[in-house]
């Protein structure tokens, strides 16, 4: 009975992983196709593995593979589809081993050996990365994305990372509808939406987290007015209350006010806006909490929660200007402005930009690159098939799984996959930089001829995550429903 249940669970796991492999395999590589995902009346068009998996949770195994892809996305930005395809191919090979009564413990031990062999191979073929190689790396990461036709995003991503000394968290992305993807640009400044009339060249910036509007009663409270004269008095009191707040802001010396968005009431009333305009104070209204945190971090100031706490000490002197119809605070942080014809294009462009930024970050942390075009996976497959370290039979099955990545890469490019994989296998024995060239339709030198390279950290992460995740899945013997 227990054996029957175990077989049912394993069959379910392998079938779920194979369905996911079939879905994602067509999105691999520069000629990979996009997926249209529809959920809750929201439509997303993307070929990013992590984004697709975010919407697919039909089986518990999908959640595990989704977490693996999300980790790859967070660590490296690139390789989110490759890691899932490699894991799927490994599970397919392992299922045939289990059918031949190979014990899971033996397979897990050999997966660990395969990981060591794979990392050793990457260490052997990696090359030092120079500043000139940055463009090639970022372009390779973007070749399957919506921004593949333009080199502007790669250039601006590198420029943006230079502005913040390689710290991706200090880059803010602003999306605007209109224009095209070529209009992407990195600014060494903070860009904010506001009324652009009479922008001063210099300003004193203050950030507030309180509302400039009349105070509200509690949700269940009511105000009953019996005398019409009291209505006028309430209006005058509200006017006086807001005017006093505006005068205190003016007294502090603030000339540019950033107001955080409120979910309870309007952050800036029409009356407050009128008074501040009369006092020559420029207002940036309804700024999101995360943007307020970014502004404060970039400018090294503290947001003020009460009007009485606003003082000259809480302000910062800045130079301002106008860029693309937005207020520019010069010299602080970094903003990358993305443009596109509609929301769907801009969202996908943002995901592409994130990949580009992560690739630059990877190369700053580990300045080594490896050839692309399935070269690493095929090279590891050759090493495993020739290795005598573990169980030769198991290692050869794992080697077949690694050949899956160049196979799907060739198939998606419209080539004959079996023929190309065989050609790549023979080429790699003579040249460790050989890979599948989508341009020529044959195996060629990825570094010299095609300039298709990727950070070594991406390949290290793909191999490590895929093998460790498969090893964990292999140890599952039952799926238990949890209490809701």
Swiss-Prot record:
It is found in: Cytoplasm. Belongs to the TCP-1 chaperonin family. It comes from the Eukaryota. The lineage of its organism: Eukaryota, Fungi, Fungi incertae sedis, Microsporidia, Unikaryonidae. Transmembrane segments: none annotated. GO terms for cellular component: cytoplasm. One of its GO terms (molecular function) is ATP-dependent protein folding chaperone. Component of the T-complex protein 1 (TCP1) complex. It holds the Pfam family Cpn60_TCP1. It comes from Encephalitozoon cuniculi (strain GB-M1) (Microsporidian parasite). This is T-complex protein 1 subunit delta. The keyword ATP-binding applies. Molecular chaperone; assists the folding of proteins upon ATP hydrolysis. The gene is CCT4. The keyword Transport does not apply. Keywords: ATP-binding, Chaperone, Cytoplasm, Nucleotide-binding.
């Amino acid at each position: 009975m227990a054996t029957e249940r175990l077989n049912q669970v394993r069959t379910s796991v392998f079938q779920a992983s194979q369905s996911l492999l079939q879905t994602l395999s067509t999105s691999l590589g520069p000629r990979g196709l996009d997926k249209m995902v529809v959920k809750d009346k929201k439509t997303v068009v993307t070929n990013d593995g992590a984004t697709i998996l975010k919407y697919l949770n039909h089986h518990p195994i999908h959640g595990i593979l989704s977490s693996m892809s999300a980790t790859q996305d967070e660590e490296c930005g690139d390789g989110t589809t490759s890691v899932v395809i490699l894991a799927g191919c490994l599970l397919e090979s392992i299922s045939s081993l289990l059918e031949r009564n190979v014990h899971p413990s033996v397979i897990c031990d050999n997966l660990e050996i395969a990981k060591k062999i794979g990392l050793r191979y990457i260490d052997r073929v990696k090359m030092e990365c120079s500043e000139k190689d940055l463009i090639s790396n970022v372009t390779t990461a973007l070749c399957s994305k919506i921004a593949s036709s333009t080199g502007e995003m790669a250039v601006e991503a590198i420029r943006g990372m230079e502005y913040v000394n390689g710290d991706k968290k200090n880059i803010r992305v602003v999306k605007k509808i209109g224009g095209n993807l070529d209009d992407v640009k990195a600014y060494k400044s903070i860009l904010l939406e506001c009324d652009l009339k009479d922008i001063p060249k210099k300003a004193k910036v203050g950030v507030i987290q309180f509302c400039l509007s009349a105070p509200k009663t509690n949700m269940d409270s009511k105000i009953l007015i019996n005398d019409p004269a009291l209505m006028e008095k309430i209006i005058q009191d509200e006017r006086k209350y807001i005017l006093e707040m505006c005068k205190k802001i003016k007294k502090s010396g603030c000339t540019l006010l950033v107001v955080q968005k409120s979910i309870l009431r309007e952050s800036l009333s029409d009356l407050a806006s009128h008074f501040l305009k009369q006092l020559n104070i420029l207002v940036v209204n309804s700024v999101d909490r995360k943007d307020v945190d970014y502004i404060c971090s970039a400018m090294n100031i503290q947001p003020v929660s009460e009007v009485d706490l606003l003082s000259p000490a809480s302000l910062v002197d800045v130079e301002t200007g106008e860029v693309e119809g937005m207020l520019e605070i010069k010299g602080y942080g970094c903003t990358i402005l993305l443009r596109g014809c509609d929301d769907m294009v801009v969202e996908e462009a943002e995901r592409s930009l994130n990949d580009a930024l992560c690739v630059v970050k990877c190369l700053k942390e580990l300045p080594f690159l490896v050839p692309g075009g399935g070269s690493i996976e095929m090279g590891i497959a050759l090493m495993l098939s020739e290795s005598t370290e573990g169980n030769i039979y198991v290692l050869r099955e794992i080697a077949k799984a690694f050949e899956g990545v160049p196979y799907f890469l060739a198939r998606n490019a419209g080539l004959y996959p079996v023929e190309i994989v065989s050609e790549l296998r023979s080429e790699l024995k003579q040249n460790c930089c050989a890979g599948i060239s989508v341009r020529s339709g044959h195996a060629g030198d990825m570094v010299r001829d095609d300039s298709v390279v990727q950070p070594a950290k991406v390949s290290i992460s793909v191999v490590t995550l895929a093998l460790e995740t498969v090893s964990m899945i292999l140890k599952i013997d039952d799926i238990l429903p949890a209490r809701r």
